[in-house]
Amino acid sequence: MMAAPLIWLMMLSLPASPPEIDYKKIFGSDYTWAVNWLKQNDAVIDDYAVKYQLPAKELKAIVFPELIRYNGVFNALEVESLKYLYVSEGKHYANFSVGYFQMKPSFAEMVESDALQLPVGQWMKSAGWKDVSVDTEAGRRERVLRLCNTRHQVLYLCLFYKICESKFQGRTFRSPTDRLKFFATCYNAGYHLSEKSILSFQTKNNFLQYNYSAISAFYYLNEED
C-alpha cells in the first residue's frame, strides 16, 4: 500500500520542465510586424513554394527571426554605404546583412556557387540571374540588386533549403519541426558547418540573447499559415 504514495512523492521531486518562452510577448511590436509582413507577402513565398515543391510554412519560419531583427535595427543610410563598398571592393571589405531576410553577400555567393553543383542551379537561369557566382564588380552589383529584391531573396531562400536537403540527406528528422529547427540553425550559423557543429550551435542563445531555432519553431507552431 505504500508503493503508490512513494511513486507520487518521487514524481513531485522531479524537476519541472521549464515553461515555453513567449517570443510574441518578448519581441512585442517587432514580432507583430514580422507576422504581418509574412501575411502581406504570402503570395510571393507561396508561389515559389508551390513551383519548387517546398514547405512554405518552413520557409517563412526559417527567416522569421531575421524579420524581427530587420524591423528593430534597419538603418537605410548605413546599408547604402556598405552596398557601395561591397560592389567596389568585395565581401572582405563589406559583408553586411541586407533585405528583409538579412542575407549577406557572402551567403548569396555561397548559395550561388553550391546551387550550380545541383539540378536546382537551373532555377537561377530561369529567373534571369546574371553573373551568377562571379566575383567581379559587375557580378557584385548584380548580386546586390538581387539581395534588395524580395522575390529574389525568396529564391535564394528556396535554393538554400534545397542545398541543405542535399547536404544533410543522410540525417533522419523526427518531425517537420525538428527539420525546421536544424535548417533554421543552418541559416543562422551557416550551412557550411559540420552537422555536429550545427547541432551544438542549435542549443545556444546567441540571437538577440535568445535561441534562433526556438523562435522559428515558435512561429511555426503558433501562427496561422
Placement of each model-derived feature along the sequence:
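N-terminal cationic amphipathic segment used for targeting or macromolecule association
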Residues: 1-2, 47
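Sec-dependent N-terminal signal peptides
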Residues: 3-12
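Catalytic glycan-binding domains that act on GlcNAc-containing polysaccharides
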Residues: 14-225
